[in-house]
C-alpha cells in the first residue's frame, strides 16, 4: 500500500493544501478500495474516472493500481473539492506521487461529463460517488455509460447506505446491458442478465406488489454490500427491442 494512503488510514487524518490537519471521515471502506484495485489490475484500463473525490482515498486506491498497470489518466470530477474539502483530496493524491495521473474538473458532474463525451473520452473503469439523490446519480450513470468501454466496469458506492443509490443499482440491473460482479473478481458475474418474466401472473404481481418483492435484489444478482460493480456487456442501442436494442418506451418495474 502506498505510504501516504497507509498513513492517512492509520492516523485517520488528512492534510489540506493550506497545511491544516483534518480528521478523516466519509471515505470508502478498505474492502471497497481493495475491490477497486483488483478491478484496475484485472481490466488494465488506460483511463479511469471518479465522480466525487472528498479526501482522495478512492483516488489513491485507483491511482496506485493504475500506475502499476501503466495507465495514463485518472479523471476526477468534484465541484466541492476546492471549497468544502479544502483541496485535501487532490493534495493527498499529489503527496502520494500521482499528480501526473490526475485530471481534475472543478464542475458539477452534469456539466463535466457531457464535455468529456463531446471530447471523445473513453474510460475503462468509473466510480460513481457524487450527489446521492436518484436524479443526480442517474444522470451520472447515463453519461458514464456513454464514456465506458464495452467490457469496462462502473462501481456504485453507498449502495446499502442510501436508498436512491440502491434504486439506481436496480435500474441498471433491470434495464441496461450490465452484469453485477462478485466483489472479489472483475471476471465472475453474480447472475445472468435480467430478463423479465412474460407471464400474466408475474405482470399482475409487478402491478400489485413492490418491485423488490417480485424481483428481490438477490435474484438480480445485487449483493447486500455498500458497493456494487457492474460490467458493461454491450453499448446501449435504441431500436425495436430486438438484437439487444431498447424500445423507445422500454420500462420494467424496478
List PLM regions with ranges.
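Mobile, glycine- and charge-enriched loop segments
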Residues: 1-35
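S-adenosylmethionine/decaboxylated-SAM
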Residues: 23-27, 33-254
Amino acid at each position: 500500500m502506498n505510504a501516504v494512503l497507509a498513513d492517512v488510514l492509520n492516523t485517520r487524518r488528512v492534510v489540506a493544501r493550506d497545511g491544516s490537519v483534518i480528521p478523516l471521515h466519509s471515505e470508502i471502506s478498505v474492502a471497497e478500495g481493495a475491490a477497486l484495485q483488483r478491478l484496475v489490475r484485472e481490466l488494465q484500463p488506460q483511463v479511469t474516472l471518479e465522480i466525487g473525490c472528498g479526501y482522495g482515498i478512492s483516488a489513491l486506491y485507483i491511482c496506485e493500481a493504475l500506475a502499476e498497470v501503466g495507465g495514463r489518466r485518472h479523471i476526477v470530477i468534484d465541484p466541492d473539492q476546492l471549497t468544502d474539502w479544502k483541496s485535501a483530496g487532490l493534495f493527498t493524491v499529489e503527496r502520494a506521487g500521482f499528480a501526473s495521473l490526475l485530471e481534475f474538473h472543478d464542475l458539477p458532474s452534469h456539466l463535466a461529463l457531457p464535455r468529456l463525451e463531446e471530447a471523445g473520452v473513453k474510460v475503462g473503469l468509473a466510480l460513481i460517488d457524487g450527489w446521492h439523490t436518484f436524479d443526480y446519480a442517474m444522470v451520472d450513470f447515463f453519461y458514464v455509460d456513454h464514456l465506458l468501454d464495452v467490457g469496462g466496469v462502473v462501481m456504485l458506492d453507498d449502495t446499502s447506505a442510501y436508498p436512491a443509490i440502491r434504486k439506481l443499482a436496480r435500474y441498471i440491473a433491470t434495464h441496461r446491458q450490465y452484469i453485477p460482479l462478485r466483489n472479489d473478481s472483475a471476471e465472475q458475474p453474480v447472475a445472468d442478465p435480467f430478463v423479465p418474466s412474460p407471464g400474466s401472473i408475474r405482470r399482475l404481481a409487478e402491478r400489485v406488489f413492490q418491485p423488490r418483492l417480485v424481483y428481490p435484489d438477490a435474484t438480480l444478482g445485487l449483493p447486500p454490500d455498500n458497493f456494487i460493480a457492474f460490467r458493461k456487456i454491450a453499448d446501449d442501442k435504441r431500436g425495436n427491442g430486438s438484437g439487444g436494442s431498447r424500445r423507445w418506451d422500454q420500462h420494467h418495474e424496478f
